[in-house]
Amino acid sequence: MYIDFSSLFHQSSKDLRDKGRVNIPLDPSTWPPEWTTIYYKSYPRSPKIKLSPRAPLSGDYSEILRKRHSTRSFKQQPVDKEKLSQLLLYSCGMAERGRDYPARAYPSGGARFPIEIYPVVFSGNKDIPSGVYHYNVKEHELDVLWQRPFTKAQIADLFTYEWIQNASFALIMTGVFWRNQIKYGERGYRYVLLEAGHISENVYLTATALDIGCCAMGGMKDNNIERLLDIDGITESVVHSLILG
């Protein structure tokens, strides 16, 4: 018998009080610390690449919105450290606003921030060599996971389409599901995917302002990418990617 697990999950994660939804008191002072603690993933033993500080973006916002599009044609140039710095900071970095908790450049349900960003650089240079990195959002720096050139065959092991081999880099988004589900139960899984979408549009708009080509990519080979990132695919798993260059 065929079971449509996507429909089953969607129904099971609806906000129904009689279906085991986590009961969230209206008074935040009664919440457990796990609901309000902001967790940051880091690699304390890995080398670091400090990214450039915030710089103003040029361009009229309405014009950026008009120009925003997906492209599969890239300039075939090495990654630019300054542009990558601004791309990460404006699209998924810390926001410069006065809050009682650290804000980001995108909305996150309950400020749980379940998404982690891994830049995978296909075409590098002396500033940022080809390799795999993790974006440390708190410090605005790259954790170096490993550095070595990518072959076309290795890129093909990660993504479905050949044109990706001409890109400069990819941004891989993973979801750390327990950060949301500890507060929102099964429904928290939905919020992880929504957050990936929020970040994705930020990346598109910032890339447009920086004159970087961008294409959201669902044709990922999830298990291969998770092995590349050395994540278990259960507590943390790939949810989205963007190809840039």
Predicted regions and their residues:
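N-terminal accessory segments that position/regulate proteins before the catalytic core
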Residues: 1-178, 183, 196, 210, ...
